[in-house]
């Protein structure tokens, strides 16, 4: 959603966004080794040019993580405890990275299948991310608290808040900014990047407001590959679901496509998934299965399920 590094001279208050072309180039090179980002040179006018490394077209990317030795299903799962995530604290921004991002690099935590970025962000009042570029990435934002103001190079201006979901297909290239709309409270949101199954598509933006009654003690689909399905859609065979559960509620999740894995993120509360105990902000990935048994172990447990291809 925002750029893949956090430098104070780049991401500033609304009243101070000046930066140099060289700063921007150095800034971009720090994150994701160029994946999902491009440099828009002022000398090119409105022409957007990729100047840093790109993803190789649809090469297998594997699982890229170690098996979870504590899991009851062991060799086909991985657990990422909340306190093991990478962290960036710039005062105005606190971001926790499940996977390698910006200055946090862990070769054992680069991605889960096509799920490349899962950032848990908190931005202070009136602050945010100045205009910056992306290309060839599906970018999903899920606000948890507060209001986030979005502007982009396609002419979209929007406010997203808790209960909404936002998606951008960066495709051939998009510029956007995101700011905390409020001057008296922080905004918290999840930023998720998914590798697309089609490159250089026409950029697009969408957002919807979810009917939260549909996620009471069950999973509500919020994202899929199909524009006609419930929720937003992306260029990938991925499905996202949100559920809000009372204590001791049990449910079963059916994997949507053979070859997909499931990455579960506990937004709040606690749960057991396939017998694995998980607390708030823990992540748990599992593959080579057809379904998952899930049990909430506290009141008001909120779980995000990301059902994604394990190979490209």
Regions found by a protein language model. Give the residues of each.
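Glycine- and acidic-residue-biased ligand/ion/polar-headgroup-sensing regions
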Residues: 137-151, 164, 255-274
